[in-house]
Amino acid sequence: MRKKLNKKLCMDDIYEICILTHGNNRKKAHLYQLTFDEDERISTNALWVFTHFDMQNNEWLYAKHDDLIDRVLVEKKETKRRLMLHLLLRQPFEEESLRSDFIDFCIAKITACSQPYAIRCYCMKLAYEQMKYYPELLEELRMALDMLEQEVLSPGLQSAKRQIILHDFKEKL
């Protein structure tokens, strides 16, 4: 698997690895271990493959929830950070296991103009998924979203913001 991940991947390669790991926890664990590889291409490609797992196989990553959060908080490479945020967005966030450090990270990235749009959008959605349990936290999220009024937003950021506002409004009905 490492050899395959050491080259530029096409979608057929990704699907082949997904099929290879389908229902095989040992191979998923090996693929996950490759996300730590020193070779940047291998680790990034391994994360990219995980983003293509179907929902059934994606559940295997639920046990890696806190590990993914820990890694996102310190990751320097934007591509890997974006891929890990994508993986976290596909996981449930339970009220009893929220992490304030990750909430703070997400709020900080929402308003950081220096961050890529994809990371800001993912952080917006992840912040909502964590903060929706508490009205006072939702108010903090609304304030962060209001701060975005001061800048010209990309269509993707506008859409993510609108989705959160609409979702929050529907929850109150």
Task: Describe the residue ranges of each PLM region.
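Alpha-helical scaffold domains
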Residues: 1-173
